[in-house]
Amino acid sequence: MSAPIHENERIKARSNCLRGTLRESLADTLTGAISPEDTQISKFHGFYQQDHRDRRQARPEQYLEPYFGFMLRAPLPGGVCTPAQWLAIDGMGRELGGGSLRLTTRQSFQYHGILKRDIASVIRGINAVMIDSIGGCGDVNRNVLCNPNPVESALHREVYDWAKRISEHLLPRTRAYHEIWLDGEQVGGGEDVEPIYGRTYLPRKFKTAVGVPPHNDVDVYANDLGFAAVADGSRLIGFNVSAGGTGRNTGIPATFPRLADVLGFVEPERTLAVAEAVVTTQRHFGDRLDRTQARLKYTIERMGLDAFRDEVERRAGIRFAPARPIGFTDQGDRTAWVRGQDGRWHLTLYIESGRLIDGPGQSSMQGLREIARIHQGDFRITPNQNLIVARVPEPGKSEIEALARKYGLLDKGIALRLNGMSCVALPTCPLAMAEAERYYPDFLAQVERLTRKHGLAEQEIVTRMTGCPNGCARPYLAELALVGKGPGRYNLMLGGNGRRYRLNRLYRENLDEAAILAEIDTLLGRYAACRQPGERFGDYLIRDGIVRPVVNPAEDFHE
């Protein structure tokens, strides 16, 4: 007798390696939606069906179906793209992607509001410049993060190459994507084979990051799988491997955020074998009945870390060496020009909540379009939703900086903003309980007023906001975070550290804006008066006993 499984597992099994009935759904002109089963399969192709929640009430009154649109996400390993690719990305956003473009916390880009009839055109448009959307969503490995640090550029290039190789190695092998979206023909030669994923892929999504100490921009311990580079000078000698990090699910007490456990050290040549072994261990042992318990962290909690490590070693044919000493001492994007080891320059542009748009009072898409037309290097999306104009030769600096200033992409370097981010939330995310992206700028402005009041305007504080507990902006590592609870109400989370390897904890629940700001005002006043030299806000909150550190999240996160 077979074990019970979630309906999504049956949908994947009968999808014929992710084909489903997507062609039929796309051809159905009577609705702006795709079939319910295809909404699960479409995720593997990089897009989600959504509806515009600001229009939900009015549509039925007009005897209309919901205003359906699609969010399409395209992975860019390490967030790197060329100027030619950027111009194509921008063009698709302006023409078919709702007139905007969003940089994500996972160094990808995504469009919102694509109509069903335009999905194929968008996919073909980005494919023309060698970008695809397969694996942008779904129960597979998502975009692989890589530290965009331009200072240690020789080491960064080597680590970035490994991030690309991990990404390519863990891609689905099905031909369905090319058949449906690109050439329109089913390729002969027998059934697809998925050597890593199998017919039902993973129980849930899977996220991987590659970090370069001392900078933890990628939040390496907040990922299912993490590789922290270990270097001898500028030479990569291996990685400390970690597994089992991520956030939690909405309204389910049995779920909890968790930092990844360190499995040990491996040499670079073992990297792909270890990555595959962790993925296949999760494929085999992950929960396929309860999707709220299906992430890798819960698999490790059930198996125990030692048993999980043994299984990964067996599958990879390796033995982990003891983890090497490393230190994450920094995070956040650097402002101003930074010179790389190759003599070229890198400029980080501030993109509020990752949103690029042309409209009243802002023209960020146009500004980047003009920069891309003259830029000879590349662009790098950061895990903080900002954008690095990378590898600029000395003679090109002045023109690029002038364009950045003209279009308001510089001079926003207030410490609080550069260390903050938010998820999309309303009106497009179906899970959002409260505003995030649309409210975050106003919230930050009010917190900035409080930091100035207490003489803390130059103090970095990692601040994040999400519209629901799922935590797409990784709020559970922030020093100060708001997690949506309901319309206009948030849980106030406190106590992460500035280097992003300590979980925060619920401080106050279900607060409105006035109550949140009153709490922050009091806390900032205490911090300004009582902090020790060099002490960060989150560290002070722990030292002073305002919040207790989370030691074992499975047991004490909800206390």
UniProtKB/Swiss-Prot annotation:
Annotated GO biological process: cysteine biosynthetic process; hydrogen sulfide biosynthetic process; sulfate assimilation
Keywords: 4Fe-4S, Amino-acid biosynthesis, Cysteine biosynthesis, Heme, Iron, Iron-sulfur, Metal-binding, NADP, Oxidoreductase
Protein species of origin: Thiocapsa roseopersicina
Cellular component terms (Gene Ontology): sulfite reductase complex (NADPH)
Catalytic activity, as annotated: hydrogen sulfide + 3 NADP(+) + 3 H2O = sulfite + 3 NADPH + 4 H(+)
InterPro entries: CysI (IPR011786), NiRdtase/SiRdtase_haem-b_fer (IPR005117), Nit/Sulf_reduc_fer-like_dom_sf (IPR036136), NO2/SO3_Rdtase_4Fe4S_dom (IPR006067), NO2/SO3_Rdtase_4Fe4S_prot (IPR045169), NO2/SO3_Rdtase_4Fe4S_sf (IPR045854), NO2/SO3_Rdtase_FeS/sirohaem_BS (IPR006066)
Gene name linked to the record: cysI
Protein residues bound to siroheme: C472
NCBIfam families membership: CysI, PRK13504.1
Subunit record text: Alpha(8)-beta(8). The alpha component is a flavoprotein, the beta component is a hemoprotein.
Cofactor binding summary note: Binds 1 siroheme per subunit. Binds 1 [4Fe-4S] cluster per subunit.
UniProt key word Glycosyltransferase: no
Name used for this protein in its record: Sulfite reductase [NADPH] hemoprotein beta-component
Cell wall biogenesis/degradation among keywords: no
EC assignment: 1.8.1.2
HAMAP family: CysI
Cofactor dependency: siroheme; [4Fe-4S] cluster
